[in-house]
Amino acid sequence: MTTKNIAIIGECMIELSQKGADLNRGFGGDTLNTAVYISRQVKPDALDVHYVTALGTDSFSSEMMASWQKEGVKTDLIQRLDNKLPGLYFIETDATGERTFYYWRNDAAARYWLESPDADTISQQLAQFDYIYLSGISLAILNQASRARLLTVLRACRANGGKVIFDNNYRPRLWQSKEETRQAYSDMLACTDIAFLTLDDEDMLWGELPVDEVLKRTHGAGVMEVVIKRGADACLVSIQGEALLEVPAIKLPKEKVVDTTAAGDSFSAGYLSVRLNGGSAQDAAKRGHLTASTVIQYRGAIIPLEAMPA
């Protein structure tokens, strides 16, 4: 069997959080979470998982890469930029457990991965991949020229028989305006094969619409397979020309839910670990729910390896 490959594009940042008088340090990023959880759930000879970003030449960046390699995520497409650093965010938790996030990322290395001397070579390599996965955040951190260049890469990948997967993860503060985001998402969906959506993000960006209208709009943009993630509710899978699937989530007692930080990222990973290996959408959605329901029972985006579902 030929080993297929997936390139997951995005940004991973240094995470600082306060515990009493101490600061805890970790690493976090939506697409990185997905990369790790796919890597943990596929057989190594079935799918190679590559992460695509830019980092600095600092020790934090080196630690990040080492931790990804331990997870089986390939780092050969990651660039190290001399004059840049990874972004950073701080999580402040108040007495009620409510969290506030503060970001320092405006000049992070990841913003420049398509502007570096190696960008042409990496773009050519990406065009040969079986799958490319990215999120709304992967788009948001790029300038207009880099976004246009990325779309060219995605179109080339599809022309070569590859598939593009997009998660609509929308963070308004990363965009200049809704108009800019709508245009970028429309361009993106026009070259997407599988789209992961949450209705919260859809409503925030496009205005509230019934689910069937959201599906109609997304299919109309050119997407063949649309997966709507609905947290503790059943997910919906709509494949062009097939009956709508509704797959129930795994119900957990309230006291078991510890941290929903990476629920959506891990659902996508579970889904893709089955779907990209030839599994049905029904089985993929079940795996997505199982992965997410496991992850939210632990603190932090990346749970211990031994806690992963069988």
Curated annotation (Swiss-Prot):
GO molecular function terms listed in the Swiss-Prot or TrEMBL record: 2-dehydro-3-deoxygluconokinase activity; ATP binding; nucleotide binding
Positions annotated to bind substrate: 29-33, 89, 103-105, 171, 265
Top-level EC class: transferase
Purpose of the protein: Catalyzes the phosphorylation of 2-keto-3-deoxygluconate (KDG) to produce 2-keto-3-deoxy-6-phosphogluconate (KDPG).
Residues of the active site: 265
GO term, biological process aspect, one: D-glucuronate catabolic process
Gene3D superfamilies xref list: 3.40.1190.20
The protein's name: 2-dehydro-3-deoxygluconokinase
Domain of life: Bacteria
Catalytic activity: 2-dehydro-3-deoxy-D-gluconate + ATP = 2-dehydro-3-deoxy-6-phospho-D-gluconate + ADP + H(+)
Organism the protein comes from: Dickeya dadantii (strain 3937) (Erwinia chrysanthemi (strain 3937))
Keywords of this entry: ATP-binding, Carbohydrate metabolism, Kinase, Nucleotide-binding, Transferase
Family in the record: Belongs to the carbohydrate kinase PfkB family.
Induction: Expression is probably repressed by KdgR, which binds to its 5'-UTR.
Pathway: Carbohydrate acid metabolism; 2-dehydro-3-deoxy-D-gluconate degradation; D-glyceraldehyde 3-phosphate and pyruvate from 2-dehydro-3-deoxy-D-gluconate: step 1/2
Binding site for ATP: 169-171, 229-234, 262-265
Enzyme Commission no: 2.7.1.45
